Amino acid sequence: MSDSKFLAETTGDWQSMDDFLRHLADRPASSFLLPHASPQETAAILSAHYAEYQKELFFAADAACTNELSLFGQTFAYSDEIDWQSDPVTKWHWPILYRESLNAFVGSTRPVDLIFFWELNRHQHFISLGIAYWLTGEQRYVSAFIRQVKNWIKTNPVQHGMNWYYPLEISIRIIAWTMAFQFFRGSPEFQQEAGGEFMKSLWQQIDFLSCHLQSVRSKDDVPNNHMIAELTGLILAGIAFPEFNTAHKWRDVGLNLLVEQVTAQTHLDGVNKEQATGYHRFVSELLLLVVMQSRRGSLKPQPILEATLEKMLNYILFSTAPTGTNQMWGDSDYGRALGLGQKKDFWDFRPLLSAGTVLFNRPDWKFVSGRFDEEAFWILGHEGMDHWKRIASRIPEQTSCAFPQGGHFVIRDSWSADSDTAFLRSGKFGLGGEGHCAHAHSDLLSFSLWLQGQPLLVDSGTYIYHGPLRDYFRSSCAHNTVMVDGHNQAAPNPNFNWRHVLNARCLNWSADHVSGIFNYRGVEFIRTLRRTGSGNWTLDDRFAGEGTHEIDWFFNFAPGLDFDLRENDRILFVTRAGSPFLKLHLPDGDFDFELQLGWYSNQYGLKQRTQKLYAQWRGRLLEDGTLFHWSFEADQIKSVSQRGEYAAAV
């Protein structure tokens, strides 16, 4: 793309690319996306309040200068140039073909997983390099950025190669490039050596994205988080670069479609319809970026987006476990909108509550989030920090909460850090229904349980989107639910989507119990989970149907526990760190019980062995239902107290 052709796509009368770049460099910082104008002021706040984060930021930026990158907690080092076309894990090289010729490589028979490859090419480490340069003025950060971005542009010709295949990935990269540009734009070295190439490539990616949104790619597609991410990238690009002729279209069309999609993809109670909590986080982060621009006056007021975001964050509030982490329902590729807190546990969603505290003046969110997180600081700036300090923390009025449209139910005895808390799912299988539900798992009427603030029963997670263990992690046996006659609750398609989808619904709920129901091939299953006292819970499973059936139960335990199964006594003893933790009383009847090895993954691409209790019953169901009773009894009964912080450990 020539300079003249590029400048023809702008609204000004710039005579050269140098003039255009100087114009962007001279624009006030307030006209870009992050509300930070003074590196000295920001550096002082980081040193005073976020010293450990600041250390990690510079460590990551220094490593990136030597082509060493951290992806999902794993380090990948490149001795020469970064290989943008190869999977970092297997080194499998994607061909540089026209994007539509790559369809054959991307289906269910593709040779490797794509997530590490895409994470590498999202370029969120460019933001760290930019911040490090902006704070220090050290040229090595600029030099590394120039070297890497020029190499990427050279090795990724327009519409060729896997980095032009998925518009979602292009959108996240656009956001990262736009944020990084805010910090590099004043560098003479950047302007002279890479500025023109950078801006041309950025425009080409935005232009491509505007013509390849998810909703127009296929009539069979069900728009999901991809569409929301794509629209967010368009909107933010339109805000950051009003100099482009079509910037107003990117912004306005993107905004109209975003309101439409957010409304369509979110239940009225704030639960994301994909039934995948990791994508609930991802979408919340994207909406936060857009709502923040509205609050800053870069967009007109967005009451629908604000109301939806507040409800989504309220779901996060109640889905936060005593350990400070959220639930791992459904799939997750561990993607983040900005990646400003990569070192933190992905499942700690409290940074979102931290920002939401300020945006929506929520003292209860401040209580649970505990601190004004560094991610919130970057997005909301110094004024956001001042606002946070003025809000008085308050314990949430409710302990338990139901999200009936989303089908999520929370039972909690207190907001203390040693609370007993249960989370149960009883609702729609996923987004799109039959043949879709791409990121849902076979987990209806599954539940997770924390006793005395510690995890007991957990969701197994996702692990990976490719390979033989993909189906294990999304199957019923990886969740704390049941299988009828040896079948998953739905039939998985390769890698994504489900057939023969069923749904569950809630029968009744109160602050200390919940009952849900689904029907699988003529067998009605009703599960009732009840808190009967401090450290004590009961689980009643009732099955009704005709004929003889086989019922399988799965209880997937958290890592770090030990077990003693005494089948004759119908008790499973659970210990933690050598101390008694729980007695699980098993049902009477003709059962087979067995402790089996399971898997647990709370980071993409990493897994560890855990144990699970497997139980099987075979017999003829009674006409009015056959009841199986389980009870959980904590060995050390706590004294419930309202502590000053919820899940104080960060």
For the regions a language model picked out, list residue spans one by one.
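Extended, charge-enriched "interface" segments that sit outside catalytic cores
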Residues: 2-108, 115-119
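Acidic-aromatic substrate-binding/catalytic surfaces of carbohydrate-active enzymes
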Residues: 7, 31-40, 444-466, 470-491
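Structured loops at beta-to-helix junctions and adjacent beta-edge loops in soluble globular domains
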Residues: 37-38, 63, 75-77, 85-89, ...
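Beta-sandwich/jelly-roll carbohydrate-recognition scaffolds of carbohydrate-active enzymes
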Residues: 83-87, 91, 397-400, 407, ...
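Aromatic-lined, polymer-binding surfaces characteristic
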Residues: 94-107, 111-310, 314-325
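Extracellular structured ligand-interaction cores
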Residues: 115, 120-122, 406-408, 444-446, ...
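CBM-like, beta-strand-rich accessory domains located in the C-terminal region of large
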Residues: 171, 337-345, 358-372, 377-378, ...
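Carbohydrate-active enzyme catalytic cores, enriched for enzymes
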Residues: 271, 275-457, 508-513
